[in-house]
Amino acid sequence: MLVEFWADWCPPCKMIAPILEEIAAEYRDRLTVGKINGDEHTDIVTRYGVMGFPTMNLYRDGEVVHRIVGARSKRRLLAELADHF
């Protein structure tokens, strides 16, 4: 599962949102994509050590196996995730 931590006021979050929607649709058989509003869920942000938005955590068996901080192009994001799913 890929979880994006985001905020309404975050321009890079708005930029990456459609990319994550595309990835969720294209890889739905192998990857679940979710979003957590960091301003509304500060306890979760703190628990996972999120220091900026957007942050995307890739989870396997409940553990973070990869973290990406900042917006990426679709190609670059998929390249960073390729070894994990």
Could you describe each region identified by the protein language model?
Residues 5-19:
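Conserved redox-active cysteine motifs that mediate thiol-disulfide chemistry
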Residues 47-51:
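A short glycine-leucine-enriched loop at secondary-structure breakpoints
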Residues 36-46:
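Structural microenvironment flanking redox-active thiols in thiol-disulfide oxidoreductases
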Residues 5, 35-36, 68:
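Structural motif
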Residues 52, 57-85:
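Non-catalytic, surface beta->alpha helical segment in thiol-disulfide oxidoreductase systems
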Residues 17-36:
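Conserved helix-turn-beta segment immediately C-terminal to the redox Cys motif
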Residues 2-3, 33, 56:
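Hydrophobic beta-strand anchors of alpha/beta hydrolase catalytic cores
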